[in-house]
């Protein structure tokens, strides 16, 4: 529908130790950080979907993004995985705010900390435990339209960025 190839990943498939600058100096970034950085860098557009923990992003997401921010291969500039691509954000929570507070923290980290281009459009799915049908589609028509709109903007922007 959106004319895009999609790669779904789970951060659980990229286990890493808690970021520690001393460990990085001693051993370099972990293999999974390099693999995740390469996965991000292989795509012109990245959609990050995450639950909310205590009004912020999950520790797993924060740690993964921190490690990826430290990976430099060859003559790459710092934060290469976050440059020259576009990010879109989504959250889901069983609360009534749908993870909206976590998106603030995630946006701040990506834009200010990593210099990433993050779309202003985002989606927060409230009451997430009951928000999806058995095929993982959003039940609420308004939320489904918003998700499609965010995805369409991500694809359109990524395609423009990828053009030589």
Regions found by a protein language model. Name each.
Residues 2-7, 116:
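A generic structural motif
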Residues 116-164:
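Glycine-rich phosphate/pyrophosphate-binding loop and the adjoining helix
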Residues 28-114:
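Helix-loop-strand module that forms the ligand-binding subsite of alpha/beta enzymes
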Residues 2, 68, 110-113, 154, ...:
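Hydrophobic recognition helices of helix-based DNA-binding modules
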Residues 8-28, 131-135:
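N-terminal beta-loop-helix "entrance" segment that forms/cooperates
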Residues 7, 88-90, 123:
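Hydrophobic/aromatic beta-strand patches that form the interior of the parallel beta-sheet core
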């Amino acid at each position: 529908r959106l004319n895009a190839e999609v790669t779904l990943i789970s951060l659980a498939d990229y286990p890493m130790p808690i970021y520690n600058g001393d460990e990085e100096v001693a051993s370099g970034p972990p293999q999974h950080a390099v693999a995740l950085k390469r996965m991000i860098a292989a795509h012109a557009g990245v959609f990050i979907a995450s639950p909310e923990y205590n009004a912020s992003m999950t520790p797993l997401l924060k740690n993964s993004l921190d490690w990826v921010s430290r990976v430099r291969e060859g003559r790459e500039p710092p934060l290469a995985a976050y440059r020259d691509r576009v990010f879109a954000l989504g959250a889901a929570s069983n609360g009534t705010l749908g993870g909206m507070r976590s998106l603030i923290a995630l946006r701040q980290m990506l834009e200010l900390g990593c210099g990433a281009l993050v779309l202003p459009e985002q989606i927060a799915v409230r009451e997430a435990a009951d928000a999806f049908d058995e095929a993982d589609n959003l039940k609420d028509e308004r939320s489904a339209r918003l998700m499609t709109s965010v995805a369409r903007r991500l694809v359109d922007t990524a395609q423009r960025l990828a053009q030589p």
